Amino acid sequence: FNAGGHINHSLFWQNLAPASSNEAK
């Protein structure tokens, strides 16, 4: 089952997105 991993990854990325949005792109 990879549902938990997917949810955790989504929250993790949403938390990093605003902080590393400029560096990511």
UniProtKB/Swiss-Prot annotation:
Destroys superoxide anion radicals which are normally produced within the cells and which are toxic to biological systems. This is Superoxide dismutase [Mn], mitochondrial. It is found in: Mitochondrion matrix. It catalyses: 2 superoxide + 2 H(+) = H2O2 + O2. InterPro entries: Mn/Fe_SOD_N_sf. Mn(2+) binds at H9. The keyword Metal-binding applies. It comes from Alternaria alternata (Alternaria rot fungus). Keywords: Allergen, Antioxidant, Manganese, Metal-binding, Mitochondrion, Oxidoreductase. The lineage of its organism: Eukaryota, Fungi, Dikarya, Ascomycota, Pezizomycotina. Its cofactor is Mn(2+). Its EC number is 1.15.1.1. The keyword Oxidoreductase applies. One of its GO terms (molecular function) is superoxide dismutase activity. GO terms for cellular component: mitochondrial matrix. On the 2D-gel the determined pI of this protein is: 7, its MW is: 24 kDa. Could be used for the diagnosis of allergy to Pleosporaceae.
